[in-house]
From Swiss-Prot:
The lineage of its organism: Bacteria, Pseudomonadati, Pseudomonadota, Betaproteobacteria, Burkholderiales. This is Dihydroorotase. Its EC number is 3.5.2.3. Zn(2+) 1 binds at H17, H19, K102, D250. Binds 2 Zn(2+) ions per subunit.
Length: 346
């Protein structure tokens, strides 16, 4: 890393948690990620979900076809865990270059209805993943109606993550988009088989952002933004230098009219300015010197993949993201639209 007061050059980063959808909508958003990141872990929660190696490879080709000419970008593919995903598919996935499987508790978030209803049902598949070296990516929230929305992550640790670690001690697990002090502490104290991603919105904002001046649906994501004490714990984890924590935007594009709705869907779109927002968060914490490891080194090291060799440069220059982007035939409202951002990718 090279840095001055107003310029920051780091190894080209990767995004270890990304949604790009499919079809024409996908073609609208892939260029934003490809402009910033060399690789990205692609979430499999399409309709229908990506549950076979063959489907993953077909999806990968569709994503690659949306990468603008002259840009180098590698989608890293995942499978969607269901109650019925057979262990044999894990072997085929490994051979096809799939790197991970995603665990969505049924009903936890967007397009998760096919998710796992009982972890015991997938133990043979998890055993195959541990044996083959595929990572387990978890949306760490319980879905029981008797658990408060803001407590679902902490409950997931006690009810599911601790038993998973006990029963599969050498299965690498990524606790995705952590949002709480409890999650940060759990990952910090866990062994080398546990890592975590953190989004830009959870580093920059607390739950007040959803309600300032009225309901602000474009700040609504799952897991939802939490109290300021939790945000500060996430900043401390991200800037700690610990290799367990790494960049994962969870950038989740939705048509604006489906966000600005009586039952608006969850997800923040950050791919247009992701690395700039991470730089802002690290700068606010006085920890720009820790950004490169978080954004560019910790993720590939955890996945046992080579680090990138290219560089990107950010400058301290105010700019304002547009109010909207095309999203297929609809419009997409990005996170921080119309707001001045202090760092800019050049």
């Amino acid at each position: 890393m090279t840095a001055s007061t107003n310029t920051l050059t780091i190894t080209r980063p990767d995004d270890w948690h990304l949604h790009v959808r499919d079809g024409e909508a996908m073609r609208s958003v892939v260029p934003h990620t490809a402009a910033q990141f060399a690789r990205a872990i692609i979430m499999p929660n399409l309709k229908p979900p990506v549950t076979t190696a063959e489907q993953a490879l077909e999806y990968k080709q569709r994503i690659l076809s949306a990468v603008p000419e002259g840009m180098a970008f590698e989608p890293l593919m995942t499978l969607y865990l269901t109650d019925n995903l057979p262990p044999e598919e894990i072997v085929r996935a490994k051979a096809a270059g799939v790197v991970a499987c995603k665990l969505y508790p049924a009903g936890a978030t967007t397009n998760s209805d096919h998710g796992v209803t009982d972890l015991r049902k997938i133990y043979p598949t998890l055993e195959a993943m541990q044996r083959e070296g595929l990572l387990l990516l978890v949306h760490g929230e319980v879905t029981s109606s008797d658990i408060d929305l803001f407590d679902r992550e902490a409950a997931f640790i006690d009810q599911h993550l601790i038993p998973l670690r006990r029963d599969f001690p050498e299965l690498k697990i990524v606790f995705e988009h952590i949002t709480t002090r409890e999650a940060a502490q759990y990952v910090t104290e866990a062994d080398r088989f546990v890592g975590a991603t953190i989004t830009p919105q959870h580093l920059l904002f607390n739950r007040n952002a959803i309600f300032t001046g009225g309901i602000r649906p474009h700040y609504y994501c799952l897991p939802v933004l939490k109290r300021e004490t939790h945000r500060l714990a996430l900043v401390e984890a991200a800037t700690s230098g610990l290799p367990k924590f790494f960049l994962g935007t969870d950038s989740a594009p939705h048509a604006a009219h489906l966000k600005e709705h009586a039952t608006g869907c969850a997800g923040c779109y950050s791919a247009h300015a992701a690395i700039e927002m991470y730089a802002e968060a690290f700068d606010n914490a006085g920890a720009l010197d820790k950004l490169e490891a978080f954004a560019s080194f910790n993720g590939p090291d955890f996945y046992s993949l080579p680090r990138n060799t290219g560089k990107i440069t950010l400058v301290r220059e105010s700019w304002t993201p547009p109010d909207s982007f095309a999203f297929g035939e609809a419009q997409l409202k990005p996170l921080r639209s119309g707001e001045a951002l202090p760092w800019k990718l050049v």
